[in-house]
Structure formats: structure tokens, C-alpha cells
Regions:
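DG-centered beta-turn motif at the end of beta-strands
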Residues: 418-431
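Short beta-strand segments
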Residues: 79-80, 105-109, 162-166, 240-241, ...
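Flexible, low-complexity linker and terminal segments
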Residues: 2-10, 20, 137-352, 357-358
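Thiamine diphosphate
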Residues: 1-140, 168, 232, 258, ...
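A short alpha/beta connector and helix-capping loop motif
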Residues: 435-450
């Protein structure tokens, strides 16, 4: 009898990676991806095998460290939240040009509805323009199985593979059947290193190879066990359901969907399966979490007169994460009976914790800033961002990791005085140091406060 475990989506992916012969995981923490690395760190197999686990300085360094392990023939995993892909983009996009040696899987955990993020960007776009195959599990079992398939795919085509999770997938639990444990790869090196040296002449050759391979990736997607066409008698509408959206569809049709369904969990989008559905159905409904990536692609594949519905046409909300109820409404089904929610506790808005050192920083900072009519305070990403809320109202901006120092510098260049930056220890080592170099180089008239709370809170501690 197969062993079964109750796992978060993050944990299922992490366990699948360990069982696939993982040698190293490199990550920068961020909701909803953090639990992947934490699970690997605490698993007995990690200690038994000596799997390398690292919280890197930022997502770019994590990507590069994993690429180095892949160069040496070992299987490596990179984990980050969706906005971390912006930081890792230079290394990620160019890793498609170098290719991989040992299996290399990059996990991006998206945050629709921005539960803990600045935006709800969709990481599938990175897979598209980097020409990297992308996997998107629809449930926890697939998260476990798929990461193992992703490592195999990476080594088959010598290419990094992107895996996309979403908040609900990452942070919900299900029973997962687990399989045997694969041995780690032995250390080995590429037969030739020309493609690893991205000089223009080498890159032009490699890019043509990558374009040829991308066509093969689509063929693989059309034949993948993770993409499935299920026929049904009512062909008035065909449904394309991507990733966790397929779970929501199944929840609304527990006895089977009466319409044809194309489940998509591996990209590039297989045009042949889309054309088959279009030829058999009167219209298409596209259900996907995040931005209308597949909906836009389908409109490019199919002739204009076909009725295509989804997030772009209002059948599904344009923003925010999907729910079984929003999918139910798009399917034209009557809503479930509901009951008024009980008011068990009074809502508690976010606030800096009692006793947190950041409170003292903001209390002192507010007193000083109140003495200067034009004082501006530029904050950064971390729990200290909560200084914007009552009772402090102490900051004016929070944009992205490291922006506090550079925005304060730019404001000072424009004549703002005093111009104050507030940044945490982790964010300073992530991307604040380069901005400080600019400020020092130009002798900028700014004040930089590095608020080191000596512990792991929203991000992680830096020594």
C-alpha cells in the first residue's frame, strides 16, 4: 500500500523535490513560497543526505547559485515569491540561454488578491518570454508528482523549468501518495561549455537551438499526462481550466462536467488541443488563476469570430483570486445556499506587534519628522511597512525591496530635506547596499535608518 501524507501544496512540492534526488535548494523567503524551503530544511532526508539548504541574499543570487549546482551536474531547486522573479530575471532569462546540466527547477509562488504582496503579477509570462517550459499543478498530488517530472524534463532537454504555484495551492492541504526516493546525481560537467559563455556569437547559435526546442516543448505539452482533454456530450461550450482552476471546476461538477474540458498544467499552451476543442465546441470558457495568459494566447491561436470568454470579457473577475463560487457563476450555475457568517471576533487590522523594536523607531522618528514641515520618510518591504498605519502614520512610501534608500536619494536630489530612509536588516542585504553606494558616492544629503530587529519576522534575519 502506498504511503500517504497530509501536506500543504508547498510541502508536497518540497517532498517531491527531495524524493527526486535534490542536492540543493536556494531561496529568498516570501509568502507564499517560504514553507517549501522550511520543509526541506527540517526533513530527515535532508540531514541524511547532506542536502544543501540556503537562504540566499536575494532571488538573483539564489538563481545563480542553483545554476552553478546544475552546471556541476546536481539537481537544484530555486524558490521565491512572484515579485522575486523580477529580481531574479537577469539570471533566469539568461539561464534559458546557457541551459542546464543537472536538473534545475525554479519555483515562483504567485499571490493573486495580493494577500501579502505589492501586485498580483503572473509568473507564467516569465516562462513565455524566456522560452522556458512551465508547469502549474492543479492539486497537491500533482505538486508532488510534477516537480519530479520537471527535473526529468530539465535533464532531458538541458533547460531550466519554471513551476508556478498560487497562494491557495501553496497554503491548502490534501492527502498525497508518495513514492520511492531517487538517488542524487553524481557530480558531472557539461561535455562542452560554449553555450555557458554568453558572448554574442555563442548566444546567437544557442538562441536558434532554444527556438527549435521550444517547438518540442509544445509537442511534449500536447502529449503530457498533466494536460488532459475530457470529452462530454454538451458541446455548447468547451472549458479550458488551468492549474488550481481545474480543482474549482471539479468542485462544481462532482459527478463529472457535462461539457468538454481541457485541463492545462504544462506550458507552452498546446495549440493542437485548443484547436480540437474549438472545432468541436460552440464557444470557449477559459478559467485561470491570475492574469489572462491563456485567454490571450487562445485568441492568438483561433480565428476571431469564435466566442471566447474569461477574465477579459467579465465572465470571471479581472482581478483577485478565483473561488469555487466565482467559477460557479461563470458556468451559469445557481449559487449555493449561504448562511450569514457569525461575528465571532472583532476584526483586527494589521499592526506592529506590541513590544516590537520597530515601534520605538517610529515613535522617535515621528517626533523628529514632526519638527520639520517638509520631512519625507521612505520605507521598504518588511513588517516595518506597518508604520504607515495608525497610530504612527510615519512613512510616505513603500514600493519594492531596497527602494527606500534610492528613493530618498532621488528626493534629496530634488531638494527634499530631511529625506529619510527606513530599511530592515534583511532588505538592506537583499538590495539596499547598492543604493547606499550611490548615495555615498554622490554624498547625498539623506539619513538612512537600518532597523535591525534581531529576529525573523516577515522576511529573515541577517547577521
Amino acid at each position: 500500500m502506498a504511503q500517504r501524507e497530509l501536506l500543504l501544496g508547498d510541502e508536497a512540492l518540497a517532498l517531491g523535490a527531495l524524493h527526486a534526488g535534490l542536492s540543493g535548494v536556494y531561496a529568498y523567503p516570501g509568502t507564499p513560497s517560504t514553507e517549501i524551503t522550511e520543509f526541506i530544511q527540517g526533513h530527515p532526508l535532508t540531514a541524511e543526505r547532506g542536502v544543501h539548504c540556503t537562504w540566499s541574499a536575494n532571488e538573483k543570487t539564489a538563481m545563480e547559485e542553483a545554476l552553478g549546482m546544475s552546471f556541476a551536474g546536481k539537481r537544484a531547486l530555486v524558490c521565491m515569491k512572484h515579485v522575486g522573479m523580477n529580481v531574479a530575471a537577469d539570471a533566469f532569462v539568461n539561464s534559458a540561454m546557457t541551459g542546464a546540466n543537472g536538473g534545475l527547477v525554479v519555483v515562483a509562488a504567485d499571490d493573486p488578491s495580493m494577500h501579502s504582496s505589492q501586485n498580483e503579477q503572473d509568473s507564467r509570462f516569465y516562462g513565455q518570454f524566456a522560452l522556458v517550459p512551465t508547469f502549474e499543478p492543479s492539486n497537491q498530488q500533482e505538486a508532488y508528482d510534477m516537480v519530479q517530472a520537471a527535473f526529468d524534463f530539465s535533464e532531458k532537454y538541458r533547460i531550466p523549468v519554471l513551476m508556478r504555484l498560487t497562494t491557495r495551492m501553496a497554503h491548502s492541504r490534501a492527502v498525497v501518495e508518495v513514492a520511492g526516493v531517487r538517488a542524487e546525481n553524481e557530480c558531472s560537467y557539461p561535455a562542452q561549455t560554449r553555450q555557458w559563455v554568453l558572448m554574442p556569437g555563442n548566444s546567437r547559435v544557442r538562441y536558434n537551438t532554444l527556438l527549435d526546442d521550444y517547438a518540442r516543448f509544445e509537442t511534449e505539452a500536447a502529449e503530457s499526462r498533466f494536460n488532459r482533454y475530457t470529452d462530454a456530450p454538451d458541446k455548447s461550450v468547451g472549458i479550458i481550466a488551468c492549474g488550481i482552476a481545474h480543482n474549482y471546476l471539479t468542485e462544481n461538477y462532482p459527478d463529472g462536467c457535462p461539457h468538454p474540458v481541457l485541463k492545462i498544467s504544462q506550458y507552452p499552451l498546446p495549440a493542437s488541443l485548443v484547436r480540437r476543442m474549438a472545432s468541436e465546441c460552440g464557444s470557449l470558457l477559459i478559467i485561470e488563476e491570475g492574469q489572462p495568459v491563456v485567454e490571450q494566447a487562445v485568441r492568438g491561436i483561433l480565428p476571431a469570430p469564435l466566442d471566447i470568454r474569461g477574465r477579459m470579457t467579465g465572465q470571471l473577475p479581472r482581478t483577485g483570486e478565483l473561488t469555487p463560487d466565482s467559477v460557479r457563476a461563470a458556468l451559469g450555475l445557481a449559487p449555493h445556499a449561504t448562511h450569514a457568517a457569525s461575528q465571532i471576533v472583532v476584526p483586527r487590522p494589521p499592526a506592529l506587534c506590541q513590544g516590537c523594536g520597530h515601534r520605538d523607531v517610529y515613535t522617535a522618528l515621528k517626533e523628529i519628522a514632526d519638527e520639520h514641515e517638509n520631512a519625507k520618510v521612505f520605507s521598504d518591504i518588511g513588517c516595518y511597512t506597518l508604520g504607515w498605519l495608525a497610530p504612527f502614520h510615519a512613512i510616505d512610501t513603500c514600493v519594492d525591496m531596497g527602494a527606500s534608500i534610492t528613493m530618498a536619494k532621488g528626493a534629496a536630489d530634488a531638494g527634499v530635506y530631511p529625506s529619510i530612509a527606513v530599511i530592515g536588516d534583511s532588505t538592506f542585504t537583499h538590495s539596499g547596499m547598492t543604493g547606499l553606494l550611490d548615495a555615498v558616492n554622490e554624498r547625498s544629503n539623506i539619513t538612512v535608518i537600518i532597523s535591525d530587529n534581531l529576529t525573523t519576522c516577515l522576511l529573515y534575519t541577517s547577521d
